[in-house]
Amino acid sequence: MFFYDWYVGLNDVIYDCIAILALGCAITCLLLILHRSALHRLHLVYADGSRRYCQFAAI
């Protein structure tokens, strides 16, 4: 009986770990996607700013 309880407890822990890992992966993926688009936007702004600066410096 003890072994059965231990097995069920272990299964609960494993399922909890899987759920936490899945949630963690989903959050990480979401953050990466958001971060990537934010980086892309930031890069566009930076590229635009540096282009203007170069034009200003060329005058």
Curated annotation (Swiss-Prot):
Origin species: Equine arteritis virus (strain Bucyrus) (EAV)
Gene Ontology cellular component terms for the protein in this record: membrane
Keywords: Membrane, Signal-anchor, Transmembrane, Transmembrane helix
Effect of disrupting the coding gene: Knockout mutants displays reduced infectivity.
Transmembrane segments: 13-33
Bilayer topology: Single-pass type III membrane protein
Protein's recorded name: Protein ORF5a
Location in the cell: Membrane
